[in-house]
Amino acid sequence: MSGLRAASVFSPVFKRMASSIPSQFKSIIYNSHSLEDCTGVLSVHNYKPKQDLNKSVVLRTLAFPINPSDINQLQGVYPSLPEKTLDYSTEKPSAIAGNEGLFEVVSLPEHGDHGELKVGDWVIPVQANQGTWSNYRVFDKASDLIKVNGLDLYSAATVSVNGCTAYQLVNNYVDWNADGNEWLIQNAGTSGVSKFVTQIAKARGVKTLSVIRDRDNFEEVAEVLEQKFGATKVISESQNNDKDFGKKELPKVLGDKARVRLALNSVGGKSSSAIARKLERDALMLTYGGMSKQPVTIPTSLHIFKGLTSKGYWVTENNKRDPTDKVNTIKGFIDLYKQGKIISPEEEIETMEWDANNGDDQQLLELVKRGITEKGKKKMVLLKW
């Protein structure tokens, strides 16, 4: 599947695609939550869609990642949850799991506004909570979808969360001067979002100081982040928390007239206060995660004497409040990708294949459960059609 992209439109192929839409769809659903074992609330459900498919946008699923937010929803602890409904012909009100996925348009309404959509286009939903762990999905309007043609499968399937988050963090809060020696600092430098941040920032002429956990192969990991993903400099958490390093070594790293204008925090605890200390006066720290499960701690002096602003960022709420910004974000991301300034996250992802034509329900359920519970790389379910 490496390098797979949206296909061109060949009428015989897509007529065949539209005619092959099954009478029943298959989705992974839940009607309750469990903090102890969230996989136990899942089941595979086959149902006849209630929408008139001749008047709807019909999509078949190409891939969906399994994200931490998906797991938190199953646990019932995520602030944004889909509405449970009887629309899927279930005994109890249920929701389809999954917030993110890549789809292919297989049928468009016979009449009405299709926007820019064509059969064969690759698309993602504008909003979260649409239910992506399914073989087919139906949308009422073309405007509920964003075209992602031009991206490879791995980028397209993950752009709605990691890609959007990184792009908006870099571009929406600071008016950067690309001609100046301007920096952002971030912790969790090996995360998927952080890797996109360094690439997007580099494309804007912004330098990045990425903080990563101490480890035996620190130099090897730092080199990959700098050479492959465009981080300007990688430092360890020990260095991040070392005040002597901050006073003596960091100025050498940053160079003359350096301005550290933005901190991106997804860890919390001591790491968050340490990156905040490196900011210039009247700078901003954005918190978009809390991997350490420790509170964000900011020294009082930074607020009083340096005018630091600290605020939260949540991609789901941002895009709900301003869906047009999400559309523009995706377009901007695709432009950078086409220019070769963003690389595919393919190597960061472990794919799990769902035989959409021949696989049985129990195999599918076990596949998804394994994707939720196994450690290691980010998991993505890839549908084999």
Swiss-Prot record:
The keyword Oxidoreductase applies. The active site is at Y78 (proton donor). Its main location: mitochondrion. SUPFAM superfamilies: GroES-like, NAD(P)-binding Rossmann-fold domains. NADP(+) binds at residues 162, 190-193, 213-215, 288-291, 313-315, 378. It catalyses: a 2,3-saturated acyl-[ACP] + NADP(+) = a (2E)-enoyl-[ACP] + NADPH + H(+). Signal peptide: none annotated. Disulfide bonds: none annotated. Belongs to the zinc-containing alcohol dehydrogenase family. Quinone oxidoreductase subfamily. This is Enoyl-[acyl-carrier-protein] reductase, mitochondrial. It comes from Candida glabrata (strain ATCC 2001 / BCRC 20586 / JCM 3761 / NBRC 0622 / NRRL Y-65 / CBS 138).
